[in-house]
Design a protein with these regions (language model features):
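Acidic/His- and Gly-rich active-site-bordering loop/insert found
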Residues: 2-107, 112-120, 124-133
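Histidine/acidic-residue-rich, glycine-tolerant segments that coordinate divalent metal ions
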Residues: 83-85, 96-106, 112-113, 128-218
Length: 218
């Protein structure tokens, strides 16, 4: 059993590198499915840690830490794509520490932080490998905003024995140092539904005998 003190110590040791990861990925800021610089940067870090990985799509990555001991198989997931938005060089407190270098694209939804935290988590678990059991999968999902890789990632995990999947999302409304967790849905996510609306034609003078599908669809 790894103590909380040990985990906090490890987290503190990788803090600076996590900040560096976040700033680098923030500057890259690439649209879903085209996160080429981000993909290269993450893969180089995974290789530095000596972990095997699979390119699930051109830019989505699934890395594996196998402790060699029986135990749960856990997947940890982070998204890595940015949004097609122009970034303001200033925030409410003053100039930003770093801004996107890609015109018209920026990390406005925190995916740079998600990826950086998962990279830090990966480093911590590699350092503590001898004290762990089971298998940990690190999922770097490309194109969360446009669905560029979620089906392929699910398929890749489906070909493995996975007991549980964990993911996080930054949330500015929470006080620093706290996390929010709840049963059921917590935030909106990428997805869609199809509906078919059946209208009924009629004369403009007798709308009461018609069914206007525009109102229903709206």
């Amino acid at each position: 059993m790894i103590s909380q003190e040990t985990l906090l110590k490890q987290a503190e040791e990788v803090k600076d590198s996590v900040i560096l990861h976040r700033r680098k990925i923030h500057r890259y800021a690439e649209i879903g499915g085209k996160e080429y610089k981000t993909h290269k940067y993450i893969c180089e870090f995974i290789e530095k840690l000596g972990l095997p990985y699979e390119n699930v799509t051109e830019t989505a990555i699934l890395a594996t830490l196998d402790t060699g001991k029986p135990g749960p198989h856990i997947a940890l997931r982070a998204d890595i794509d940015a949004l097609p938005l122009k970034e303001n060089p200033d925030n409410l407190c003053g100039p930003r520490t770093c801004i996107s270098e890609q015109e018209g694209t920026c990390h406005a939804c925190g995916h740079d932080a998600h990826a950086a935290m998962l990279m830090g988590c990966m480093e911590v678990f590699c350092n503590l490998k001898d004290s762990l059991s089971g298998v940990i999968y690190f999922c770097f999902e490309a194109g969360e905003e446009n669905g560029a890789s979620h089906l392929q990632m699910l398929d890749a995990l489906g070909r493995r024995s996975v007991d549980t999947v964990w993911a996080i999302h930054v949330y500015a409304a929470l006080e620093s140092g706290k996390i929010g967790i709840r049963t059921g849905a917590c935030m909106a996510g990428f997805g869609g539904i199809d509906i078919t609306v059946h209208g009924k034609s009629g004369h403009g003078s007798r709308p009461d005998r018609a069914i206007n599908p525009v109102y229903v669809a709206a």
